[in-house]
Structures are given as C-alpha cells and as structure tokens.
C-alpha cells in the first residue's frame, strides 16, 4: 500500500479485541494500539470488546472489514473466523482451518514436520497421566496444547526428581491435553511472514527471565529485541525458509510469526529447531511483529493498512 492510500478508502473497520480467553488483557492492548493507529490512517474504526453477542453486533454494524485483534481460544482457533465466514465479512489474518490447526501445537508441529521443518521431539499426553514419573528424560517442557502467550508452560530441569505437582493439580487452568517436548537449549529467535514473504529474523533476549514467558513478552523493558538477529547468513536464510514453509504448509494468510530455538553453544552453525507458529501475533507496543516490520522499513501504520487491504473471506 502506498503512503496515504488508507485515507482515500473510507473503509469502516471493526476491531475485535478483549474476548474471554486467558489472553484477554493482551488482546485489549493489541486492539487499542491497532484501533488508534488505523484511526490515524483515516479509517473509520469501531472498537468491539467481544462477548457472546458479537455476531449480532456485527450484523447491525455492517463493517467493511474486521480487524481481528483477539488472542487465545475463540479468537485464533477458527471459531470467530467461522462466524465471519458465515456473515461474509472480510477479515484479517488466517482463515478457519489454518487458525484451528495452528492453535493446536501438536498437530501444527506434525504438519510442519511433514513439510520438512525441523521440530523438537515431543509426545501428546493427558496431564493426569504424567503423575510422579517423568514422561521423558529431563530437561523437557510441558505446554498446554491450545494456549498462547506462554500460559501454563512448565520447564522441567535435569535435577528435578519428579514432574511439578501443579500439572496434575486443581490449580491447572489450561486443559487436560498437554504436549511434552524435549527442551532445546540456545537462543530465542523468531521470524514473521507477511503475505508470501519471510521478513527479518529477530532475536529475543529476556531480561531477568528464564525464557520468553508472559511477563517478558508484555512488561516494558523485560526483553530486548535484536532485529536483525546477529547470526550467520546461511542460518538466517534457513530460519526464513522454515518460517515460510510452516506458514504455507499450515495454510496461513496475512501475517504469522514462527518461533525457533537456535543452539549455537558448540558451533556457529548450531542447530535450528522450529517451536510453533502464531497466526494472531501480538500487536502491543512491546510486540515482536511491529519491531520486525520496522526493521524492514515498514511502519506500524503501513503494516496495519496492508493487513486491512489484504482482508478477505475464504481464507
């Protein structure tokens, strides 16, 4: 999109945010940032804090485009996408199938691996079956299958004699199905895809945190983004290729972001492992995709305008 083109469209954009998942606060932050910037671009914007009446609200509102700033279940698992397909309202990001598939970490990993993407060893389990015995040799990671923003992620270290009790306790709020994945040491890297183009690779360096968890993602100053990442050119290109391959294999549209581990402790070439793909990457002031776009010379306003103009049904 050319600079200033949005001001000539006059499109009415409904920004969906909030919702009722565990990532509600993140979604509100993304939604407010996106709505404010789209208004500055000249779009007519309506902000919708999503509840169970969202379909009737959209029918009455009749927007030209829905900008989906929801995160977590209902917002990025194919549910709201199905509603928008039924209502025939063009929307941003991925469609029903890709959203549902990407939200399921285990199944998304199998599809990516079948396309040639290198993934970590893992197994799908019911959390109650983990019990007091390690399901695999530590270190390993226990992840809820259908959560984002690192909610419920537990790292089990080599010196822990038993799995953490919280996994099987009543305090666990992230569903019974979990993925147990071998822990991959090394650097946190991520790569966004915009349309059919892999963008820059970014290194995430949490400040004072063991890994890129909820706080290091969304607390200002809790992580540093190095973009472009300082890695060998062939490794850089390999990560871009893997991100684009996963994006295509899963059937993503618009913008996605793939996360990686790069273990270069023993050699510069190291080992690159794909962890997961995010079809609704954060758009908060501390989020990665806006930083990656900025490194490519694309402003936040230009990124959002491109996403609005890219919106469609049958995605």
From Swiss-Prot:
Pathway: Cell wall biogenesis; peptidoglycan biosynthesis. The keyword Lipoprotein does not apply. Its EC number is 6.3.2.4. ATP binds at residues 135-190. InterPro entries: ATP-grasp, ATP_grasp_subdomain_1, D-Ala_lig_Van_CS, D_ala_D_ala, Dala_Dala_lig_C, Dala_Dala_lig_N, PreATP-grasp_dom_sf. Binds 2 magnesium or manganese ions per subunit. Its main location: cytoplasm. Keywords: ATP-binding, Cell shape, Cell wall biogenesis/degradation, Cytoplasm, Ligase, Magnesium, Manganese, Metal-binding, Nucleotide-binding, Peptidoglycan synthesis. Mg(2+) 1 binds at residues 259, 276. One of its GO terms (cellular component) is cytoplasm. It is found in: Cytoplasm. Cell wall formation. Belongs to the D-alanine--D-alanine ligase family. This is D-alanine--D-alanine ligase B. It comes from Brucella melitensis biotype 1 (strain ATCC 23456 / CCUG 17765 / NCTC 10094 / 16M).
């Amino acid at each position: 999109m050319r600079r200033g083109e949005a001001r000539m469209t006059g499109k009415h954009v409904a920004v969906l945010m909030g919702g009722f998942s565990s990532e509600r606060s993140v979604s509100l932050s993304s939604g407010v940032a996106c709505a404010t910037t789209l208004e500055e671009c000249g779009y007519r914007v309506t902000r919708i804090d999503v509840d169970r009446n969202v379909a009737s609200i959209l029918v009455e509102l009749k927007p030209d485009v829905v900008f989906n700033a929801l995160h977590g279940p209902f917002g990025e698992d194919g549910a709201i996408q199905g509603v928008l397909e039924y209502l025939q309202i063009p929307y941003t990001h991925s469609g029903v199938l890709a959203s549902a598939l990407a939200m399921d970490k285990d199944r998304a990993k199998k599809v990516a691996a079948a396309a040639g993407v290198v993934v970590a060893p893992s197994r799908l389990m019911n959390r109650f079956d983990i019990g007091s015995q390690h399901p695999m040799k530590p270190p390993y990671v226990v992840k809820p299958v259908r959560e984002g923003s690192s909610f419920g992620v537990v790292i089990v270290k080599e010196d822990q004699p038993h799995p953490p009790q919280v996994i099987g306790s009543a305090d666990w709020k992230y569903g019974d199905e979990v993925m147990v994945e071998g822990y991959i040491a090394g650097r946190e890297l991520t790569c966004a895809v915009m349309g059919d183009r892999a963008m820059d690779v970014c290194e995430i360096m949490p400040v004072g945190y063991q890994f890129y968890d909820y706080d290091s993602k969304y607390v200002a100053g809790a992580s540093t983004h190095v973009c472009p990442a300082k890695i060998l050119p062939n490794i850089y290109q390999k990560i871009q290729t893997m991100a684009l391959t996963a994006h295509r294999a899963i059937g993503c549209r618009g913008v996605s972001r793939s996360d990686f581990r790069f273990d270069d402790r023993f050699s510069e070439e190291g080992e690159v492992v794909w962890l997961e793909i995010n079809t609704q990457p954060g758009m908060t002031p501390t989020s990665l995709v806006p930083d990656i776009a900025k490194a490519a010379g694309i402003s936040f306003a230009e990124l959002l305008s491109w996403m609005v103009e890219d919106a469609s049904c049958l995605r």
